[in-house]
Structures are given as C-alpha cells and as structure tokens.
Amino acid sequence: MRTWLLAVLLLSVIAVTYGQGECDSDPCENGSTCQEGEGSYICQCPMGYDGQNCDRFTGSNCGYNVFDANGMIDSPNYPAMYNNRADCLYLVRITKARSITFTIEDFMTEVFKDVVEYGIGPEADFNQALGSFEGNLTQDDVIPAPFTVQGDQAWFIFSTDRNIVNRGFRITFSSDGDDCDPNLCQNGAACTDLVNDYACTCPPGFTGRNCEIDIDECASDPCQNGGACVDGVNGYVCNCVPGFDGDECENNINECASSPCLNGGICVDGVNMFECTCLAGFTGVRCEVNIDECASAPCQNGGICIDGINGYTCSCPLGFSGDNCENNDDECSSIPCLNGGTCVDLVNAYMCVCAPGWTGPTCADNIDECASAPCQNGGVCIDGVNGYMCDCQPGYTGTHCETDIDECARPPCQNGGDCVDGVNGYVCICAPGFDGLNCENNIDECASRPCQNGAVCVDGVNGFVCTCSAGYTGVLCETDINECASMPCLNGGVCTDLVNGYICTCAAGFEGTNCETDTDECASFPCQNGATCTDQVNGYVCTCVPGYTGVLCETDINECASFPCLNGGTCNDQVNGYVCVCAQDTSVSTCETDRDECASAPCLNGGACMDVVNGFVCTCLPGWEGTNCEINTDECASSPCMNGGLCVDQVNSYVCFCLPGFTGIHCGTEIDECASSPCLNGGQCIDRVDSYECVCAAGYTAVRCQINIDECASAPCQNGGVCVDGVNGYVCNCAPGYTGDNCETEIDECASMPCLNGGACIEMVNGYTCQCVAGYTGVICETDIDECASAPCQNGGVCTDTINGYICACVPGFTGSNCETNIDECASDPCLNGGICVDGVNGFVCQCPPNYSGTYCEISLDACRSMPCQNGATCVNVGADYVCECVPGYAGQNCEIDINECASLPCQNGGLCIDGIAGYTCQCRLGYIGVNCEEVGFCDLEGMWYNECNDQVTITKTSTGMMLGDYMTYNERALGYAAPTVVVGYASNNYDFPSFGFTVVRDNGQSTTSWTGQCHLCDGEEVLYTTWINTNMVSTCQDIKKSNMVGQDKWTRYEQSIAPQPDA
C-alpha cells in the first residue's frame, strides 16, 4: 500500500464558531479558498491537499477536487485507458449540502488490483472507507445502485498496479441542501425542506408556490344587487348601492316602513325608492293630490262640471240629459216619417229625410219620375216608386232607350275586319286581302295568273309568291337566269347560255362539260415500235426505245451508216445495233482484232459492256445513258407532268406532284369538287380547278347556297309593317291601318262616314276619332250623354236628362239649379219672445227661451213651476224668467254647483284640502296644526318611544290634554326595575308654545330628572328630538351620553339596533 496511507493520520478537531463570518479568520491553508456554509465553512483545496483546512499534503499523483452541487468524477484519460501506478485522490466538497448522492455510470477496472474506495469527511483515509469497487462491473452488468453519504464532504481514492489497465470509471453526483434557506415563502407561510425542493404552507387568504398570491375572494362575485366587492386578506367587503344593505347587499331596504303613502295609498317598495299606488281619485308621489275629474271638461253641450272624490257631476242645460249632458231629447222616438223616411232629430224638433221616390213633410207623397219624360227615341215611360221603366222602340236599348244596339258587339267581322255599327245593322271594313259581308273570303291574288315562264303561283293573304321553273327568277319569274354569269367554262372554253343550262365550246386540247379535262392524245397509241407516249396539252411526245427515232419512233436507226465493220466485213443493220459478217474469222464483232476494252468493266450502273475494235459499247439499263452509263436519264426532260405538276426525276422513271385540283400519274385529271354535291337548296355546282362554284337558285346565296337571302334586310315594309322573309321574296304583314305590297298606303277609315249624330270624323292611323257635337259621346257619337249620371241634383231633387243638359225637380224646401239651396224659412223671423229659429227642410223650429212655448214661442209659462233651483235655493219669477237665490256654499244659474272652497288652496305646508258645503277641512301633515295647517304642531306622542340609549317611554293622552306614561332607562330595564311615573304636559293647550316636558318622579322621591322636547315636524317618520335641560341624578341616557352635560337626544318608534352599553 502507499506509504502515505501507512502514516498515522491525525484527526484535527477544529472548533467552528457558528454564525456569520466563518471565513473571517482565514482558516484555509495552502492557497485554498474558503466558502461559507451553514454555521461552518469549506476549504476548496488545490490538488494534492486535503484536511479540514487543506493542511495535509497527500502526495497523490492524479485526481482533482470538485465543489459544485452537481457534477462527475472520471478516472484519468476516461474513457481511454487509465495509467499504471495511479494514486488518485478526488475530494467532493459542497457548501450547504446536507447529503450527497453518487451514481456509478460506468466501471471497468482490473479485478482485485485496481480499486476505488470512498469515504466522508475532510480527510481521505482508506482505513475509514465506507466502501470500495473493482472489476468489470459494466461488462458484467453488476453496477451497484446509487448511494448517499450524509454531510457536505466526501472523498474517493483510485489506486492501480503496474500491469493491466482498463477504461476506468465515471461517477456522477448530486447534493441536497436546505432548500428553505433562504426562505422563499411569503406572507408568513411556513417552509418545509424537501429533497432538492421545498413546500410552503400558506396562511388563510394566500396561495401560489411561494404563497405570493393573495386569493381574490371577490372572484366569485359574492356581492349581490350591484354591490361593489373590495377584496381583503382572507375576506372581502361589499359596498352596497343605495337601497340595499347586508354583508353581501342581499337585503333590499324597505322604504315603505315609514308608511309614506297618504289617503289610503298602497306603498310598493322598490330599490332605493318606493312607489305609491293611489286609491281612485288621488294622485301625486304620495297620493296627496285629489284628482280634478273636471279638468278634462267632460260635460258636453254647456253642462257645468262639479268635481268630487273620484268622480264629478254634470249640471245640464235645458234640452240635454245624460251623465255628461251628451243626450239630446229625441223627438224622433214617435217615428213620424213614413215610407222609409229617415228622421233627423233637432233640438225640440225633427226633420224627415225621405227615401228616394217620396216627398212631403212626413214623406207621404210618391214622386212621379215620368213627369220629366226621360225616355228617348220614342220609348214609353212607366212610373214606379223612386224610378221608372222605359219601354224602348225596336233597335234601341238602355235605361232611357238612349243606346243604339251595337251589332258589332259579337263581333261579326272576320280576319281582322273592322266593324262599323249602324242603326239595326253593321258594315265590315275588311283588312287588305279579304272581302265578303263579314270579310270571310281570302282574295285569290293568283287568279290573274301573274307568274311567268311556267312558274307556280302560291296564293297568300293580300299577296302571292311565284315558285319559278328551273332557270328562271324574279318576283314574277320573268328573268332567265344567266348560267354563264359564273363563267363555268374552264381552260379558255366559250360559254353559251341556255334555259336552265349552258354549253361550253372548248379550246383545242380540252374537253368535258366545263372543258375541265385535258384531251388524252395518247389514247390512240400513236407511238410505234414500243415507244412510250406522254400526253400533253393538245399534243403528245413519244419516247423511243433504243434503236428507233422519229416523231412516232417509226424509223429504225441504221447503225451500219457509220461503217463499223472493218477489214472488209459486211455490216448487217439490226434494231439498236448491227452485225458484221467478216471476211475472215475474227474474235470481235467489228471484224478487227483488238484488245478487250470491256476487261476494265467500264460500264457503270449495271450497263452491259460490248467490246469493239479499239473501244467498247455499253448497253445501259433503262434509265441510264452515256458512254459508260454514268448519266441518269432525265425522264422529266420531256415535261411529262401536266397542269403545272412538278416532275421529280428518278431512275428510269419520274413522279409528278400535282397542283391542288389535279390528280393522275401525269396530273392530267382535274379533281371534280362537285362530286360531293356541295351546293345546297337547288344550287348548281360548277367545277373549278381546286374549287367549285355554286350558282344558287333564286332566293339563296353564300358559297354553298346555304343562306336564304333575307329580302327583309332592306326593310321594305313601311309604316310599321312586319316583314316575313320567303324564298326569293317577302310578304309584309301591315300594321293595322295600312295596306299595299309594302304597307305604303294608309287606309281611310273615315271613308264609310262612321260618326253619328253630326259627329266630325278625324282620320287616324288604323282608326278614326269622332269629334261629337255637344251632348253626345261614344266611339261614333252614338250615345246621348246622360248629364244626370253624376247625380247633380242635391237634396233629393229628381234629374231629367236633356240633350247637352238636365233639369232638376226639387223636393219642397229646396231651390236652385241643382236644388242645392235650402229655403230659409227663418228669413221672416217667425219666432217670438226671443225664440231662436232653427231652419229645417221645408219648415222651421223655434227654440223658445225658458218659460215660453208654442210653435212661435207665443205662450208665456211659470218659470219656477219646474222647480229649477237646486240644493235648497229659492226660485223667484222675474218676468218670463226666474232667478235662483242660492244658500251659502252653492252657485250657478240653478245653484247646482257646490262651490269648491279648496280651489284657492287654503291648506298650507302640504296639507290636504277636503271640500265641504260652504267650507273646507285641512288634513294637515304630521308636525303641522291649525285651520289651514299654518302652525308648527306637535308629533302624535301616543305610543312607545326609544331613544339612542334604548331608554323607553310609553305615553298616553288624558282628557286634560296631559300625557302620562312609563319611563325606564336602559339600565333600569336591564336590571328589571319598576317603571317610575312619567308626566308629560304641554305648556299650552292652544299650542302657542310648541314644546313639551318630561318629569320623572322616582318612587323613592329622592330626586328628579327633567328635560323639554321640541317637535321637528317628525321628519315624516315620527322622529322626536329632545334637549336635556337639567340633570339632578346620573341615570339618564348613559350619563347624558357619558358627558354629564346638556345635550340632544333622538327618539324613534323602534328600539335602536346599536346603542351604548352600560358600564360594568
């Protein structure tokens, strides 16, 4: 073992002074740093030292010291191999730690040789080791569980031998100190230390991890009825809105407790208010006002209103009755009017308004409606009740036989004909194209055979349409169509027009209907000896086979003409060659002996070589030429492609690429674009080169004749006529009032003189207007205007119609052209003695003054006989009138009015005035007295009262105006004493000094206590205020509220809820 471990280790006992400044004495040695702890210190030693004060040299050659609360210690070079002969010391010193927990993360050392030991305390000594580790713990999966040492210091010693090494170890650590230092708990909370944590126990009213949150007791909104919540610590206070109280403003203060409503009004408590429901007849906030039911002037027809409690009485003038004088006496109750007449009640009279057909004062007379001869045109009048009936002559109708029967009403005219009514008949004015009595016949416009050149005529309404034979056109098919106009003949052909056709005279070399075909001159095979014939325009070209020549290849070429045979050989001509018959046998065809020039194969492109003397001859394959067959024969040289076709030369042939509109090997065939029949609607197709042309039938146009020419496009129809397009034509449907092919002629509707009874006809488009003479109306002035139709005669007058006028026959009592004036029978002043004349229909009524009667008020009466004076008044006749002498308290013509003595508002200080007969009574408010409530009075002292100290007095009136009662102080009541005698008296029965006094007489007669009180109107709530004037013994209101001085006291009808308590 290491020598330094064999040394005797001396434990140093260091006395540590607890408190602040443990490091003040600088106890740490060898350059170590002092760190304050809890009542102690820790020296952070440099490597190689340990001990409480780092005063021991360890001699270790590796290791280190750690002072953080959490960390790790590794073997040297970890995770690489550690060193042999390692003596490592690790010190773990953590300030304020109470325990340190170690966890072995990795451990691989030589078994039994390389060992880690650990212990606690400031000095490392293997003899004091708590445990040790060695071996391949990680590999063997036997790493020990984490272990904890108590205290703030621990050490590890790692020693190795001199041979096998390994990767070593890694040990992590964490410490747990006093987490309540410093104490983070707020607001007086208690801190509980946990493992690496703490917990705060909050006092009531606080929450949060550190009890830093004041619980808002207002969050639950506890205050009711709009109260404002003020949060406190572990509680809250509610500030109530006016009208509520209670801890949570849950109580609605009863403002009705003081009985504020007067005159029997019912108090309804509200929030911070009350509302009085008044008895009928009263109003005001407190029902203090008697409603004046006369304010709305309910009495009608001059009646006088007398106000009462919740009602009124109407004093009616003569001639009217009813609660409100609303009823006029009904003179019509006897039903005087006859024959359905309506009775109109007047004041003391009536008037009959007769039913139609009746007249007279009582409607007894039947009016003769035939008197005015109302029936016209010979009609016979038959009188009835309120009417008549006209028996008309034949041909007339209507109430007055004024209407000529309209035979056009059916209507009889057909096909748009206009019917003109006559007397017992009619005339039809037919629309263009129709005739007949009722316009029932369609006029046949084809009857005159207007269509020419064999065309078919199709009759229409007011017109016709010609369907032309082939080759003709025009409205009447009068025009021969020029089929040459479209120039159908091609290639210079001359066109000759025919009926519905044409003939083309073709130029040389062309043929066909339109000279569209190039004539094939090769068709007769003119070329001889196997030559090829190539057709051209108006000709051909022969391409000869070898050995022939000539226009038709009719000549065999004489190849012997050049004397090819030598050495006396005889030349025999052949087709495209020759044969030499030699004088002597030779090896060549030309009888010479020569080298074989064919040996070098001079003939190209498959040509066959024939050796000749001093040369060779190549027989070329078709399509090649030249000495050596090196030239591709140009088959296009003869221009074989016709009609502009493009010739492309090939070997022994060619290809023609034709221009549009041509086809065939030599482009000699023109394509017939008409083969698909592109022309529509009978159009004739003319083939063109690469196109066609349509010669359209009359009435059609466009490239393929697909469009029907709109002959309406030029708007030929005049005056609003509607154009209907047809094939090669149109038809105008004229607007009413016009006629003609193009609607150019306006129809004269006045020609038939339709206007009757002298009316002037004014011609218009499709009609006419009759300007009638005065007195007539209607479309043709056929109707005599009934000037009576507007009922111009008023007031029951009978109207008789005349020509351009009328006559009114008035009922009795009316006059004027329209019976509009009621004859004024009062104009002669028939009523006597001041009577008022009321004009009626055909009569009058006199409204007599009192005490007169008769038709003309000529009869004098006893005015007092009807006892008009009311309420005990005396009636005095004065001429024909009377005067009522009223008793006091009444007024009016008949003393019917109870004088309202309250009208002058005599009651003062809010007193309620109650009207009486010839007088009034004031119902004073509490605190006021006197006839008019003009004096300040006393409260009604009877009953039980409590003052602010809960002293009690019970007061009772006596017949002398004095008051007697029992008085007890709060102390006396609390101790159960008997009540002393109390005498309460007014200073004057006349209320000239509104004060009162209490005299308390004790049973033992020892002494008295007395005071005087002043009534302060009771404030509407019966509240008394008393002033103490002398105190002979200390037994009143808590020693005069603890002052022994003169003072004021407040008395109410209820015991005080809060009062000063007596001293113990």
From Swiss-Prot:
Location of the EGF-like domain: 20-55, 176-212, 214-250, 252-288, 290-326, 328-364, 366-402, 404-440, 442-478, 480-516, 518-554, 556-592, 594-630, 632-668, 670-706, 708-744, 746-782, 784-820, 822-858, 860-896, 898-934
Disulfide bond annotation, renumbered to this chain: 23-34, 28-43, 45-54, 62-88, 180-191, 185-200, 202-211, 218-229, 223-238, 240-249, 256-267, 261-276, 278-287, 294-305, 299-314, 316-325, 332-343, 337-352, 354-363, 370-381, 375-390, 392-401, 408-419, 413-428, 430-439, 446-457, 451-466, 468-477, 484-495, 489-504, 506-515, 522-533, 527-542, 544-553, 560-571, 565-580, 582-591, 598-609, 603-618, 620-629, 636-647, 641-656, 658-667, 674-685, 679-694, 696-705, 712-723, 717-732, 734-743, 750-761, 755-770, 772-781, 788-799, 793-808, 810-819, 826-837, 831-846, 848-857, 864-875, 869-884, 886-895, 902-913, 907-922, 924-933, 939-1015
Keyword Oxidoreductase: no
One cellular component (GO) term of this entry: extracellular region
CUB domain boundaries: 62-175
Entry GO MF terms: biotin binding; calcium ion binding
This protein's UniProt keywords: Calcium, Cytoplasmic vesicle, Disulfide bond, EGF-like domain, Extracellular matrix, Glycoprotein, Repeat, Secreted, Signal
Main location: secreted
CDD domains (alphabetical): CUB, EGF_CA
Pfam families: Avidin (PF01382), CUB (PF00431), EGF (PF00008), hEGF (PF12661)
Glycosylation sites (chain numbering): 30, 136, 851
Summary of subunit composition and partner proteins: Homotetramer.
Record's function text: Forms the apical lamina, a component of the extracellular matrix.
Name of the protein in question: Fibropellin-1
Organism: Strongylocentrotus purpuratus (Purple sea urchin)
Gene that encodes it: EGF1
